Regions:
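Catalytic domains that recognize anionic headgroups
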Residues: 2, 6-188, 192
Length: 192
């Protein structure tokens, strides 16, 4: 089953996915569920990525002065990230409520350049560290942790090219194409 609310040029709010995710989670647990959610997150234009109720959050400290374009963009980005945090939290709460033996893996597809307005956003032709240094975390339910031998080291260096191997390990899939040494949750150091 596939759902798409994506419209990167217009206002698209990720929280519209939350009720749909809950509906899937409430369905019969006869078979395991694997749900992939691709959020708009903080894709430019940032002001289209959060609800009106967040418009006053993260007003620049210097709000009594006229803000620079850079400060305005950074405030909009911070609000988009706040909204992404809210959506991820709601997804985890829903998974925790409806799927006792579960895990949620979050990874951003890229970061954004905010300091150099000439390179605003993300562009592989003008890549900066902030475009490649991205959030990545694994939440596990208590039941999942108790039944699992997974070890997650959040400080390990990792390339998202190897996400396939981490997903295979989480889902306990063995195949010739899987190299568990490239998994972020595998105990040994990755070979890259």
């Amino acid at each position: 089953r596939q759902m798409c609310i994506r419209d990167r040029h217009n206002r698209t709010l990720d929280q519209t996915l939350i009720p749909k995710i809950r509906k899937i989670l409430k369905e019969s647990n006869k078979f395991p569920k694997f749900i992939v959610v691709h959020l708009m997150g903080a894709h430019f234009k940032y002001e289209n990525r959060y609800p009106d109720s967040m418009k006053t959050a993260f007003k620049s400290i210097e709000s009594d002065r006229i803000l620079t374009q850079k400060q305005l963009i950074q405030d909009e980005y911070d609000r988009a990230i706040l909204n992404t945090d809210y959506v991820i939290t709601e997804i985890i709460k829903s998974v925790k409520k409806y799927a006792k033996h579960s895990a949620v893996l979050y990874v951003s597809d890229h970061g954004e350049e905010l300091d150099d307005l000439e390179r605003l956003g993300h562009n592989e032709d003008f890549a900066t560290k902030s475009m490649y240094d991205i959030p990545f975390f694994l939440w596990q339910s208590e039941a999942y942790k108790n039944d699992s031998i997974l070890f997650f080291d959040p400080n390990r260096k990792y390339m998202t090219d190897d996400l396939f191997h981490s997903l295979a390990e989480i889902l306990e899939i063995n195949a010739n194409e899987v190299d568990f040494t490239l998994s972020l949750i595998h105990i040994s150091e990755p070979t890259r």
